[in-house]
Amino acid sequence: MLLVEIAPPAWDVVVDLAYGHADNFMGRAVYAHPRCFLHPEAADCLARAIGHAAAQGLRLKITDAFRPSEAQWALWNHTPDRTYVADPRRGSPHSRGAAVDVTLLNAQGRELDMGGPVDDLTPNGHHDATTPTPAQRANRLLLLGIMTAAGFDWYVKEWWHYQLFAPRRLPVLSDRAAGTAMMG
């Protein structure tokens, strides 16, 4: 199975992978060569989501997609509270190319206010969080509508995380098995 590379200009998205630089909850880059990949089925859903967002004058910003199993181990080993990090022995939807972390950008390229950043690994990051303002909750619901209308499932603990239904039907992939050369 080959993954599909998601990169402008072929894809009308902004790609800024959080684990490609030090501005993330780990405080260091995880990917030596950050590139964005998805399973072909997830790429099809993403294409629909891009269209739904564009119809509303918005764009998607991708902050993570395929995450090689080596990277999943790095996150797991760094995180004392494992509530928000999938056990790499079972595999994450990201490690199957089946998940994408996204937010919305307005026509000026600024992120819509979601009431917390991507990777807000606290209850504030949950879809049902009560701390965001009504406007911030409306932005989260707008993203939820765009992504689910495109065919993605959502994850209750992360407003930014969308994945294929039944992602465990797909294999966990290492960087080498996927042929992505992200880890170095």
Residue ranges and their predicted role:
Residues 162:
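Conserved metal-phosphate-binding beta-hairpin within the catalytic cores
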Residues 1-65, 75-157, 165-184:
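Extracytoplasmic cell-surface/polysaccharide-interacting catalytic and binding patches
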Residues 68:
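Segments that shape or occlude catalytic/ligand-binding pockets
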